[in-house]
């Protein structure tokens, strides 16, 4: 069936489908203001914790009740939403790649994963979040089902798509061919994922009704959509409209112009063009990575319809932990600052705040209970501080201007990036604990204050001089606005700049009038 015919059927389905937005659900504008803590349900918290060896690739016992018990830990860092693993029943047993503890090998769309808990457990999790003013984002998989044996697939185990005719014919994916990406099967010769025929009108209707009912039943506020690019683009607007909530899709490409095309079909996307280079910027002696990050941020801002609706992340279950690339705490603080203060909705992966250092799957997916829920750790405390600054900026008198402003990034040398977002100027460095001083020329004469240290930075004439000490990040805000909005109500200090420059650069900032 041709895509235009399928699109026509999609519109017909939607005309008959009653779309009810859940009472607690956020629209895309509400999600723009959130800060998301992403977690693997099986590895974050358990009501019966046991030692977990991630290299075994087995279920370790994490569950929804465990998450409820640890919401104080998440909220203590300032996060306002969580993103949990797919909730539906997956295939059982061991495959060549282990068990389906991650949730991405579905078997039954209408049954919850019993390893994670009951229907009531999931509803209680949603209620517990909403009672705190927090929100629930659920990962969803509708591109494929799971199979442990690609040579002998038993379609009868799947629900509701239990016939081979419900799937595209098996074929290997060719990455440079869009139709192949959409209709061929993800996997290897040892394990493959049967690709659902999302061109079939009856299947479209089934999936749209499924997600509508699931969101309503379990009080879901937003969806993370797996394998977005492996389903034709025109499928997604109807899917998200049926859900009645904000969707954030996985379109894994580093090319900003191609990436941004997808925002015509889904409001939210994981910001892969920025993530790919920003994560590399923590690698020691990687002189060009931070510059590439600034370029990527500006390209995404230019090409995308609205970069403030994207999800900005640096760690994930598919990527090395940042501390595996560099365990310098100062560098990781800067990375967290970038993660939380750039355009879009911040997403922090569980354990990032504890400086997990797994370099690859599966060792980058340990159980948090084995490491401990240390709320006194330096990066946990720092994450809480920056999240609070972001939240206070959003709640300020000019909060809407701030959160909707598009970031413009410029570089000073190879190791300092300056991000301008509305009235906020954020300095990010990646050279570690080294003293340097940078002379920034800016129009106007506003005294600024560093919201991280409550240090005043005076502007003389049209020149602001600010000293970056030991590679520390900075979040600058006009002092008059800070006073009005209640920032830094305790002790304020005046910046001291050494007379001897260990490194000096000059740059003209953009006109911010």
UniProtKB/Swiss-Prot annotation:
Signal peptide: 1-25
Source organism superkingdom: Eukaryota
EC number: 3.2.1.1
Residues modified by glycosylation: 162, 357
Bound cofactor: record note: Binds 2 calcium ions per subunit. Calcium is inhibitory at high concentrations.
Keyword Electron transport applies: no
Binding site for Ca(2+) 2: 226, 250
Key words of the record: Calcium, Carbohydrate metabolism, Disulfide bond, Endoplasmic reticulum, Glycoprotein, Glycosidase, Hydrolase, Metal-binding, Signal
Keyword Protein transport appears in the UniProt entry: no
Residues binding Ca(2+) 1: 143, 182, 195, 230
Residues where substrate binds: 105, 144, 224, 229-230, 254, 318, 365
Disulphide linkage map: 52-60, 171-184, 260-304, 454-488
Gene Ontology biological-process entries: carbohydrate catabolic process
Active-site positions on this chain: 226 (nucleophile), 250 (proton donor)
UniProt-annotated location(s): Endoplasmic reticulum
Alphabetized GO MF terms: alpha-amylase activity; calcium ion binding
Residue(s) at site: Transition state stabilizer: 318
Catalytic activities: Endohydrolysis of (1->4)-alpha-D-glucosidic linkages in polysaccharides containing three or more (1->4)-alpha-linked D-glucose units
SUPFAM superfamilies (UniProt xref): (Trans)glycosidases, Glycosyl hydrolase domain
Cofactor: Ca(2+)
GO cellular component: endoplasmic reticulum; external side of plasma membrane
Major subcellular site: endoplasmic reticulum
Pfam families according to UniProt: A_amylase_dom_C, Alpha-amylase
Homology family: Belongs to the glycosyl hydrolase 13 family.
The protein, known as: Alpha-amylase mde5
Species name: Schizosaccharomyces pombe (strain 972 / ATCC 24843) (Fission yeast)
Gene name as annotated: mde5
């Amino acid at each position: 069936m041709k895509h235009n015919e399928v699109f026509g059927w999609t519109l017909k389905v939607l005309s008959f489908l009653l779309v009810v937005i859940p009472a607690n659900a956020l629209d895309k504008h509400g999600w723009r203001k959130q800060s998301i803590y992403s977690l693997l349900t099986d590895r974050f918290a358990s009501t019966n914790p046991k030692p977990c060896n991630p290299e075994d690739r087995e279920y370790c016992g994490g569950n929804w009740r465990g998450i409820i018990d640890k919401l104080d830990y998440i909220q203590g860092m300032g996060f306002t939403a969580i993103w949990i693993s797919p909730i539906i029943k997956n295939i059982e047993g061991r495959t060549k790649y282990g068990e389906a503890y991650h949730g991405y090998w579905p078997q039954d769309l209408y049954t919850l994963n019993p390893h994670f808990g009951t229907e009531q457990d999931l509803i209680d999790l949603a209620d517990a979040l909403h009672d705190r003013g927090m929100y629930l984002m659920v990962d969803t998989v509708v591109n494929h089902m799971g199979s442990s044996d690609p040579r002998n697939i038993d379609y009868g185990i799947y629900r509701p798509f239990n016939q081979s005719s419900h799937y595209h014919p098996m074929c290997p994916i060719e990455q440079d061919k869009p139709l192949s990406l959409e209709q061929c099967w993800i996997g290897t010769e040892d394990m493959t994922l049967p690709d659902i025929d999302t061109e079939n009108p009856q299947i479209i209707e089934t999936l749209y009704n499924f997600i509508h009912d699931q969101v309503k039943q379990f009080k879901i506020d937003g969806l993370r959509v797996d394998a977005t690019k492996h389903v034709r683009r025109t499928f997604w607007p109807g899917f998200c409209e049926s859900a009645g909530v904000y969707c954030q899709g996985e379109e894994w490409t580093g090319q900003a112009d191609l990436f941004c095309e997808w925002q015509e079909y889904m409001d939210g996307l994981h910001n892969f063009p920025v993530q790919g280079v920003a994560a590399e910027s923590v690698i020691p002696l990687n002189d060009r990575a931070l510059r590439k990050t600034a370029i990527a941020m500006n390209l995404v801002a230019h090409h995308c319809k609205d970069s403030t609706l994207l999800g900005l992340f640096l760690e994930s279950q598919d990527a090395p932990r940042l501390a595996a690339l560099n365990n310098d705490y100062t560098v990781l603080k800067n990375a967290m600052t970038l993660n939380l203060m750039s355009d879009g909705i911040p997403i922090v992966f569980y354990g990032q705040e504890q400086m997990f250092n797994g370099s690859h799957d599966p060792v980058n997916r340990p159980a948090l209970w084995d490491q401990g829920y240390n709320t006194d750790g330096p990066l946990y405390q720092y994450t809480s501080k920056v999240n609070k600054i972001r939240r206070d900026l959003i709640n300020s008198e000019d909060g809407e201007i701030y959160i909707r402003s598009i970031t413009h990034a410029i570089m000073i040398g190879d190791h300092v990036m300056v991000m301008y977002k509305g009235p906020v100027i954020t300095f990010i460095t990646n050279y570690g604990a080294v003293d340097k001083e940078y002379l920034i020329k800016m129009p106007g004469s506003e005294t600024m204050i560093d919201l991280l240290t409550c240090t005043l930075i005076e502007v003389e004439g049209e020149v602001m001089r600010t000293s970056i000490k030991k590679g520390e990040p900075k979040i600058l805000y006009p002092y008059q606005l800070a006073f009005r909005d209640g920032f830094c109500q305790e002790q304020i200090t005046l910046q001291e700049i050494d007379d001897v420059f260990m490194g000096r650069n000059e740059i003209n900032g953009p006109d911010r009038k």
